[in-house]
Design a protein with these regions (language model features):
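Flexible, active-site-proximal loop/turn residues at the rims of small-molecule/cofactor binding pockets
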Residues: 23, 48, 137, 212, ...
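N-terminal capping/small domains of soluble enzymes
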Residues: 1-104, 110-114, 302
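Short beta->alpha connector loops at strand-helix junctions that form conserved
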Residues: 45-46, 266, 288-289
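Short beta->alpha connector loops
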Residues: 22-27, 110-113, 186-190, 268, ...
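Alpha/beta enzyme core
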Residues: 32-37, 41, 111-263, 271-285, ...
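Extended, intrinsically disordered, low-complexity segments
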Residues: 64-71, 244, 304-332
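C-terminal helical cap(s) of enzyme catalytic domains, especially alpha/beta-barrels
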Residues: 51-67, 217-235, 278, 290-315
Length: 332
């Protein structure tokens, strides 16, 4: 019988659909609902050590419309989770007992070698199936920077050498060889070059893309930013359907030029979007923004739609489908 089983960096997934690190994975109740709906994996919202625990101000999210269609894009100035690494550890251990066939991925952000090492140890102790390292959040760069250093120095995803050395630090910290996923940003001049740093550092997989850096705009009546807290705002990240072409471009560049598994994320709203990422070489598909609009149950129609497509096109497995469209992409 045809199924959606696929391996990602050596880890078997019941299906490729994974809840991305986001508000949708930021509580035990939300994770429970996503698992009941049928998601194959969960990336818990990114966490850090207590000294970096944010105090989230609201409002920090807003939808953007285009041609009368609401939430054509989504903009946020959200930060990492307010939950502690201990809470994430507890949830990983708890859900692995209840859902041994699903995959639980801890997402971490750190400032400096000692912090990366401690966070990796914590996630391995909890039994995380994989570790996703957030090195690229466009609105989180200042909140996690090493004291006394420029924020740019805390963003490995923008520099090949820093990416290489940071990834090496993370890999050396492992005691159980838990697969490490490095999350990439599109906000760089040469994505493939920076990604090579992660590969050189020993990363097991890449996740692409993080949100696209931007600014929501100004209310012309008041002069204030459209999304503000007491009149003040900052630069944030754009997600949703509007960024899908950017994500597809980034994922396909990585899968075509590098020999490393890639998780695709960015603008996935239905099975058709997911199929495009798979055809361009992604072995895992993460969803963030669409869940806030359609709910966790959207994964059921995604599974059914993808299975129908595979049957119609004669793909006996997802392995047969992954990367099938890559040969059609050529340089000018």
């Amino acid at each position: 019988m045809m199924n959606l089983n696929i391996s990602f960096a050596g880890v078997p997934f019941e299906n490729p659909f994974t809840v991305a690190a986001s508000p949708s994975s930021d509580s035990r109740e939300k994770v429970r609902r996503s698992l009941e709906a049928g998601w194959g994996g969960i990336v818990f919202k990114t966490t850090a050590l207590p000294q970096h625990s944010p105090k989230l101000a609201e409002p920090n999210m807003a939808g953007l419309s285009f041609a009368g269609k609401p939430q054509f894009a989504f903009y946020n100035i959200d930060l990492i989770s307010e939950r502690t690494i201990e809470e994430i550890q507890e949830d990983i251990a708890y859900f692995k007992q209840l859902y041994p066939d699903r995959r639980f991925i801890g997402s971490i952000m750190a400032a400096g070698e000692e912090e990366w090492i401690e966070l990796v140890h914590r996630l391995e102790e909890a039994g995380a199936d994989m570790i996703e390292c957030s090195m690229s959040c466009p609105q989180g760069e200042h909140s996690i920077a090493d004291e006394g250093k420029k924020a740019s120095n805390a963003i490995p995803a923008a520099d090949r050498e820093l990416m290489r050395t940071t990834t090496q630090t993370i890999l050396r910290a492992r005691k159980k060889n838990t697969p490490v996923i490095v999350k990439m940003t599109p906000n760089v001049t040469d994505l493939v070059d920076v990604a090579r740093g992660a590969v050189e550092g020993g990363a097991d997989a890449l996740c692409c893309i993080d949100t696209v850096r931007g600014f929501i705009g100004i209310d012309l009546e008041t002069g204030y930013p459209k999304l503000n807290v007491n009149g003040l705002s900052t630069w944030g990240g754009l997600s949703g359907p509007a960024v899908k072409p950017i994500a597809l471009g980034c994922v396909s560049k990585l899968t075509k030029e590098l020999d490393i598994p890639v998780a695709g994320v960015g603008g996935v709203s239905n099975w058709q979007d997911a199929a495009e990422f798979l055809l361009l070489g992604a072995r895992n598909v993460q969803v963030c923004t669409a869940i806030s609009r359609y709910g966790f149950g959207m994964v059921q129609s995604m599974q059914k739609g993808l299975l129908r497509y595979m049957e119609q096109k004669g793909f006996a497995s997802l392995d047969a489908m992954v990367g099938k469209s890559l040969p059609y992409l050529v340089d000018h």
